[in-house]
UniProtKB/Swiss-Prot annotation:
It comes from the Eukaryota. Residues 145-155 have a biased composition (Basic and acidic residues). CDD domains: MeCP2_MBD. A zinc finger (CW-type) spans 1-53. Zn(2+) binds at C4, C7, C33, C45. This is Putative methyl-CpG-binding domain protein 12. GO terms for molecular function: methyl-CpG binding; zinc ion binding. Residues 130-155 are annotated as: Disordered. Probable transcriptional regulator. The keyword Nucleotide-binding does not apply. Keywords: DNA-binding, Metal-binding, Nucleus, Transcription, Transcription regulation, Zinc, Zinc-finger.
Length: 155
């Protein structure tokens, strides 16, 4: 789903190909309801929205053909989500360094035009700012004179 910049309504995108093109160009060419007229006749900002949530974020490059991208939302943690890429071989790649290592070991993908710039491990922003727990340092307990007396009595 993507959100119209004019009316702020959510629109369902029928294919990953359309979705990836919109996602890649969203900053340069903001999405508007009229964009969907190619696959949804008579679409406009006057039509009720298709949904109420969105798992997109702008400027994510399109995924190379045959590859897939997966975003795993964590249940309340210090990190909101993890992004993984899966090449046609099915391996899981968790970082830019792993992508580069994979491409170094599989030059056939490089020959097909796959390069590191086609992968983004940027995660979406949580809709609830309090979803991600803030890291805090544990409070160190200071020894009191009572603790010292207990240790002396153990001798």
């Amino acid at each position: 789903m993507v959100q119209c910049t004019d009316c702020k309504k959510w629109r369902l995108i029928p294919s990953m190909q359309h979705y990836n093109i919109i996602k890649e160009t969203q900053l340069q060419t903001p999405f508007v309801c009229g964009t969907t007229s190619g696959w949804t006749p008579n679409m406009s900002c006057n039509v009720p929205q298709d949904g109420t949530t969105c798992d997109t974020w702008p400027s994510i490059p399109p995924i190379p053909t045959g590859w897939s991208r997966s975003v795993h939302i964590r249940s309340e943690s210090t990190k909101f989500a993890d992004v993984y890429y899966f090449p046609p071989s099915g391996e899981r790649l968790r970082s830019s360094a792993e992508v580069q290592s994979f491409l170094d070991n599989h030059p056939e993908y490089v020959r097909e035009g796959v390069n590191r710039s086609q992968f983004s491990f940027q995660i979406p922003k949580p809709l609830d700012d309090n979803y991600v727990k803030k890291r805090t340092r544990p409070v160190k307990r200071r020894k009191s004179s009572k603790d010292n007396n207990c240790e002396k009595g153990k001798k």
